[in-house]
UniProtKB/Swiss-Prot annotation:
PROSITE patterns: CORNICHON. Pfam families: Cornichon (PF03311). One of its GO terms (molecular function) is signaling receptor binding. InterPro entries: Cornichon, Cornichon_conserved. The gene is cni-1. This is Protein cornichon homolog 1. The chain crosses the membrane at residues 5-25, 57-77, 116-136. It comes from Caenorhabditis elegans. One of its GO terms (biological process) is regulation of behavior. The lineage of its organism: Eukaryota, Metazoa, Ecdysozoa, Nematoda, Chromadorea. One of its GO terms (cellular component) is endoplasmic reticulum membrane.
């Protein structure tokens, strides 16, 4: 059982996806609080926008690591979300700071429902990814010479 670069990439991805799962759960909670009018949209958007760049950087980092270690299934699974992150950040509203959530439009019914749906999809993706990376890391450790 050897500790290869691919196993190292999967180990880092497990830790990173743990943070992304936290970010996704926090986003779902914040958007649900906006939907039920428990919180101020300016404060919620400020809190959510602080998590955008760390999530995108974390996801981009382990996607690049998978490219370097040439893990095809992981690359193919992560590239659509990486391209989606690039697209949403390029099309973000004009604001003074980084982020994609605009407090003036977040309370529109369509914007709020699409944000909630995207948050749930990201949470499901990160959960499935976590268990796949766990399996792939164990498989890589067991089968490496």
């Amino acid at each position: 059982m050897a500790f290869t670069f691919a196993a190292f990439c999967y180990l880092l991805a497990l830790i990173a996806v743990g943070f992304c799962i936290f970010f996704a759960i926090y986003t779902v909670i914040c958007v649900d609080e906006l939907r039920t009018d428990y919180k101020n949209p300016i404060e919620q958007c400020r809190n959510l926008n602080q998590l955008i760049l760390p999530e995108y950087i974390i996801h981009g980092t382990f996607t690049v690591l998978f490219i370097f270690s040439w893990q095809l299934i992981s690359i193919l699974a992560n590239l659509p979300l990486a391209f989606y992150h690039i697209y949403t950040y390029a099309k973000r509203p004009v604001m003074s700071g980084p982020g994609i959530y605009d407090p003036t439009t977040i309370l529109n019914r369509s914007t709020l429902s699409s944000t909630l749906r995207i948050s749930w999809i990201k949470l499901a993706f990160y959960l499935v990814s976590f268990f796949y990376y766990l399996y792939a890391m164990i498989y890589t450790l067991v089968t490496s010479n």
